[in-house]
């Protein structure tokens, strides 16, 4: 008996919900009605989701098969930043996308290959730079020391010349006032 009461409660609740949402509920169409509502809810959900791409009608080209477009496909294109939709121009005609799928795919492949080459080059270079960087650093330090020593030698020479020049000039000045 309790099982029948539960079913009655479910049926009465379903009737109440149907009347609340403005649907006519009939027991013989219960399954068909539910399936129709489920399909309607799915399509409504797809169209109600926001998407930054403009939703424009697509004209299938002769070499392509007609394709079912859903909002989920457009959302995927938004996330992957693929601009593979036709643009509607001012004169009323459709323009082909700037990049076709083949071109964008080849660009991605080229980019990934160049990135891998750079990565390999950097890893090889960084592995070889360990001892070389120390060697270069030592060479730079030696060069600095040489430059400093040369400057000191030049300063000493210039100071000696100045002392010599003053020494030679001093007797002339001493003789001049006499």
Curated annotation (Swiss-Prot):
It holds the Pfam family LNP1. Keywords: Chromosomal rearrangement. Residues 34-47 have a biased composition (Basic residues). Residues 28-55, 89-108, 147-178 are annotated as: Disordered. Transmembrane segments: none annotated. Residues 147-167 have a biased composition (Basic and acidic residues). PANTHER family: LEUKEMIA NUP98 FUSION PARTNER 1. It is linked to A chromosomal aberration involving LNP1 is found in a form of T-cell acute lymphoblastic leukemia (T-ALL). Translocation t(3;11)(q12.2;p15.4) with NUP98. This is Leukemia NUP98 fusion partner 1. It comes from Homo sapiens (Human). The lineage of its organism: Eukaryota, Metazoa, Chordata, Craniata, Vertebrata.
């Amino acid at each position: 008996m309790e099982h029948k009461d539960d079913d009655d409660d479910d049926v009465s609740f379903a009737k109440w919900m149907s009347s609340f949402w403005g649907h006519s509920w009939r027991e013989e169409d219960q399954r068909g009605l539910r399936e129709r509502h489920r399909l309607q809810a799915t399509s409504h959900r797809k169209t109600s989701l926001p998407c930054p791409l403009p939703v424009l009608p697509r004209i299938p080209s002769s070499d392509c098969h007609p394709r079912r477009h859903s909002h989920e496909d457009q959302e995927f294109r938004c996330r992957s930043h693929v601009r593979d939709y036709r643009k509607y121009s001012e004169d009323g005609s459709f323009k082909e996308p700037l990049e076709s799928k083949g071109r964008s795919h080849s660009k991605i492949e080229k980019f990934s290959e160049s990135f891998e080459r750079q990565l390999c080059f950097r890893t090889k270079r960084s592995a070889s730079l360990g001892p070389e960087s120390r060697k270069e650093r030592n060479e730079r330090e030696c060069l600095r020391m040489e430059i400093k020593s040369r400057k000191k030698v030049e300063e000493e020479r210039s100071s000696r010349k100045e002392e010599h020049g003053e020494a030679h000039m001093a007797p002339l000045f001493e003789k001049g006032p006499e």
